[in-house]
């Protein structure tokens, strides 16, 4: 995709985005934030700092376990079966025409089938449908597969944070 080009509309009828209900969210939110802590620690952050950052974001974005205004959590559904999740939201301090992929994951049993690409194409279409002109995300350095996918979809690096243990 060339710079400035709009992504093509998402047309794959097999993968659907379905809002998660309260029961699903009650299980998904704590599990997702626990996974987030592990990812932060894998990127070199201490357990204490990772938990503190996770708790602060959870309180801000899911007060009482419910998505705050502007936050949307959906199941990736393939042929009637939930195969992953997508969390879209307004970026913290972002503009009205921007949306942020806070979380996207295809369940392990369904990986390697192109569903990650389909999920991101669906996220792009969702963003356009919701008035967005830009989509952004964070990817941890150790997630080489996801970084390759995002590169192939035309995402560009905005900043890089690096560390070295001594």
Outline where the language-model segments fall.
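Acetyl-CoA-dependent GNAT
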Residues: 16-107, 126, 160-166
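Conserved phosphate-binding and hydrolysis motifs of nucleotide-dependent enzymes
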Residues: 80, 84, 114-116, 154
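Conserved acyl-CoA
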Residues: 94, 107-109, 118-134, 156
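Conserved hydrophobic beta-strand within the GNAT/NAT acetyltransferase core sheet
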Residues: 101-104, 135-139
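Conserved active-site alpha-helix within GNAT-family acetyltransferase domains
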Residues: 117, 121, 129, 141-159, ...
